[in-house]
Amino acid sequence: MIIAIAGSARMGVSQLHESLLDRITRKLRAGWKRLADILNQPGVPSHDYCAC
């Protein structure tokens, strides 16, 4: 099965899922890194990472 997405080349379903998995893992890694940065701060954590 081939899927066409606006602004990108035609790709097979396996490539579409692979890129989605890459995006998900990249966002998870970035989130874990932000959490580690927050937990490694001395004193009271700042709210730079929080959308509060």
Swiss-Prot record:
PROSITE patterns: LAMBDA_PHAGE_CIII (PS00553). The keyword Transferase does not apply. Keywords: Activator, Early protein, Transcription, Transcription regulation. It holds the Pfam family Lambda_CIII. Belongs to the lambda phage CIII protein family. Presence of the CIII protein in the cell results in the stabilization of the CII transcriptional activator (a very unstable protein), CII activates CI, the gene for repressor, and thus promotes the establishment of lysogeny. This is Regulatory protein C3. It comes from Salmonella phage P22.
